[in-house]
Design a protein with these regions (language model features):
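Flexible, glycine/threonine- and acidic-rich loop/arm segments that mediate assembly and lattice contacts
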Residues: 1-201, 205-278
């Protein structure tokens, strides 16, 4: 399914009108502000697993190394396999939301592929030229976002572990403080850093390309799901049975609505090494 992430338009720069009383009696020539619709797509995530009748009959028993306190085999292998597959799918979704390469299906045998943040953010980008992540790089990105009419309040900086270390080292070297996790957003606990452009929250993330950091406006981001009537989304169902076993599939469709892409920013080319200070 294709969905809209935003309607973009330009109103031009600020200017002072010079309209006399006489001129105001005649309406000016009409102009038209064009809009451009931006879209993304949901895509399919699907996993299958099979369980033999022999495995089902082995539920709750002990196997493997005989150690005191050993946990028995899962009581219901179906529930265990379902949970494990859902964990994998959740990580695949997170990877896609960050790194996904856009593709719109043109036929039933062509896959929809949801666009991720790396490929969505094009307006506010900053090349670090192998510099480590520091306060002024973050502030410079926020300045660029502000100059491009993006809100800079409540932003969240999504970083990998190396960049988080670099940022903490820079803050320490300059007598600054990164406030420990004190804010909850959709169940996510966030740290914060005060810059000349305002406060920005910090979140350690996975699947971020090396040398990359994101400044995200979480208020305009949400997952878009496609619900299968009578089944929901990311549901488990049994497939046709063959032999002494059972086969199941987990099926779901989801994509990322990142909102107006210029509401976000991205730094690339950061140093991928961290050298502790003395």
């Amino acid at each position: 399914m294709e969905f809209v992430t935003g309607q973009e338009y330009e109103t031009g720069g600020g200017a002072q009108p010079a309209i006399s009383e006489t001129a105001s009696l005649t309406a000016p020539d009409p102009t038209f502000i064009a809009t451009e619709q931006k879209t993304n797509v949901t895509q399919i995530f699907q996993e299958t697993f099979g369980i033999s009748d022999a495995k089902l009959s082995n539920m709750g028993t002990m196997s493997g190394v005989n150690i005191a306190g050993q946990q028995p085999n899962p009581t219901d292998p179906r529930d265990f396999q379902t949970a494990a597959k859902m964990q994998k799918m959740a990580r695949d979704i997170e990877y896609t939301f960050i790194n996904g390469v856009y593709q719109k299906a043109t036929a039933d045998n062509v896959a929809n592929k949801s666009r991720g943040l790396v490929n969505a953010i094009t307006t506010n980008t900053l090349a670090a030229e192998s510099a480590p992540l520091g306060l002024w790089l973050v502030a410079e990105l926020m300045k660029e976002m502000f100059d491009n009419n993006a809100p800079t309040e409540g932003l969240t900086l999504l970083v990998d572990s190396t960049s988080l270390y670099q940022l903490n080292a820079d803050a320490q070297a300059n007598g600054l403080t990164i406030v420990p996790a004190d804010r909850m957003y959709n169940g996510i606990r966030l740290m914060s850093l005060l810059t000349p452009m305002g406060e920005i929250y910090l979140k350690l993330g996975e699947f971020i390309p090396a040398g990359t950091a994101f400044a995200l406006n979480l208020d305009v981001m949400r997952p878009v799901e496609m619900i299968t009537p009578g089944k929901g989304n990311f549901y488990r169902e049994q497939l046709a049975k063959t032999g002494a076993g059972e086969k199941y599939q987990i099926f779901g469709q989801i994509g990322l609505d990142y909102g107006p892409e210029f509401y976000h920013g991205m730094i690339t080319g950061l140093s991928t090494e961290f050298t502790p200070g003395t």
